[in-house]
Amino acid sequence: MKIAICDDEIKYVEETKIKVKNILAEQNINAEIDLYNSSTAIYNCGKFYDIAFLDIEMEPYSGIKVAEKLKATNPYIVIFIVTSYDEYLDDAMDLNVFRYIKKPLDERRLKSGVCKALEMIDNNVITYFLKILSQKGM
């Protein structure tokens, strides 16, 4: 599992990383977590991620623009918007983000969201393999 965390405020990158690692450890899941404090770096990385936690208000690329770019690489990516702002909620929903979480992070909401995201990813993988098997006539 590959996870990206991007926020232009490094304290939120670190806080999110710690909380997500703790949740994953409770679920016995290993993940590679890449940290970004620049929207340019993640926008241009070209990497495939299963889950991304994105701040919304960043320069030069907003979290919405970064999410669009990440979805171009993996249309099944699970996007969490982590922000202090309510006014971008409609834009985020238009992009079908998975969760919109306000700062400071509510650990209970984050844990619930991450666990649901993991279930969704598992279901997508199972569906994909069943589709492959049925195409091969197995």
Model-identified regions with their sequence ranges:
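A short, hydrophobic beta-strand element within the central beta-sheet of small alpha/beta folds
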Residues: 76-86
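Acidic catalytic/metal-coordinating carboxylates
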Residues: 62-66
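The feature encodes the CheY-like receiver
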Residues: 59
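Active-site residues of response regulator receiver
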Residues: 7, 55-56
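Acidic, metal-coordinating helix/loop segments flanking the phosphotransfer/catalytic sites
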Residues: 35-51
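Conserved binding/recognition cores within well-folded domains
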Residues: 112-138
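A Lys-centered signature of the CheY-like receiver
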Residues: 103
